[in-house]
A protein has these predicted regions:
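Catalytic-site microenvironment of enzymes
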Residues: 1-237
Length: 237
C-alpha cells in the first residue's frame, strides 16, 4: 500500500512541476477563453475548383491545405479558428437548387458560418492566376472597403501589418502592394474585420512550385498568423 502511495506521489510531482506545458495543454483541452475567434475561409471547393495551373493543380486544394496549416498556427496563439470547409466539398444553403450546388448558395453558406461564429476576424484564402503574363507573381492582400470608415481603416492597418510580416518572413512570396476591394460578398456589411489573401499565382512557374510545396504552405501560414498576432497583440504560447 505504501509503495503504491509513493508511486502516485512521484507521478503527481512530475505532472505538476516537471511538465508545466502539460498542465497548460490540459487547460486548453478542458476549456479556455480564447484570445479571439477567427474564421478561416478556404476558397472554392467541390465542383468549384477555382483557378487551375497548366499542370492541373487546382486552387481549391492548395487553399484548403494552407487554411488547415493556418488553423494549427492559430491554436498556438489561443485563437479559436472556425473553418468554412475542412474537405473538398462545396457549401449549400437555401439558394442551392434541387439538382445541387450553386455559387450563390455556396457564398451564402460561408457567410452564414461567419455570422454564426461571431468572429473578430475572417481570413479568406485564395490563389491568383494571370496566364496572359506568366511573369506576374507574388502574394497579395486585399482588404474590404464595405463598412464604416473606421472599419475600413482597421482592415487597411491589418492588411499592412500582415503584408509586412509576409515580406519579412517569406521574401520569395513577393512584395506586392495591398489593395482595397469592393463588393466582396462575404464581407458585405460585416461586423467583423476581414482580409482576402491571394497566396500567389498558379500561372507563374516559380509561384506554382512554391505553392505546391507543403513546407512552403506551412511557412506561409506561419507568417500570416504572425502578422495577425502582431496586429491584435496576441502572444504565442
Amino acid at each position: 500500500m505504501k509503495k503504491n502511495t509513493l508511486i502516485f506521489l512521484i507521478v503527481l510531482i512530475v505532472f505538476v512541476w516537471v511538465l508545466p506545458g502539460y498542465r497548460e495543454s490540459m487547460d486548453i483541452i478542458a476549456g479556455f477563453t480564447p484570445a479571439m475567434t477567427m474564421v478561416i475561409d478556404a476558397g472554392h471547393g467541390g465542383q468549384d475548383s477555382g483557378a487551375c495551373a497548366k499542370d492541373g493543380t487546382k486552387e481549391k486544394s492548395i487553399t484548403l491545405s494552407i487554411a488547415k496549416f493556418l488553423q494549427k498556427e492559430a491554436a498556438g496563439y489561443r485563437v479559436s479558428a472556425v473553418m468554412t470547409r475542412e474537405g473538398d466539398d462545396g457549401l449549400y444553403d437555401d439558394y442551392s437548387t434541387a439538382s445541387g450546388w450553386t455559387k450563390v448558395g455556396d457564398m451564402k453558406a460561408r457567410r452564414m458560418i461567419m455570422d454564426d461564429s461571431k468572429p473578430q476576424l475572417v481570413v479568406s484564402i485564395h490563389l491568383n492566376s494571370f496566364f496572359s503574363d506568366e511573369s506576374v507573381h507574388g502574394a497579395q492582400i486585399f482588404y474590404p472597403t464595405n463598412g464604416s470608415p473606421e472599419t475600413v481603416a482597421k482592415n487597411e492597418t491589418l492588411a499592412r501589418t500582415v503584408k509586412e510580416l509576409l515580406r519579412t518572413e517569406l521574401p520569395n512570396a513577393g512584395d506586392r502592394i495591398i489593395l482595397p476591394k469592393k463588393d466582396m460578398f462575404i464581407f458585405r456589411e460585416a461586423a467583423f474585420d476581414g482580409l482576402l489573401v491571394e497566396c500567389g499565382f498558379l500561372s507563374n512557374p516559380d509561384d506554382l512550385n512554391m505553392l505546391k510545396d507543403e513546407e512552403y504552405q506551412k511557412s506561409f501560414a506561419a507568417a500570416l498568423m504572425k502578422g495577425i498576432a502582431a496586429n491584435y497583440n496576441l502572444k504565442k504560447l
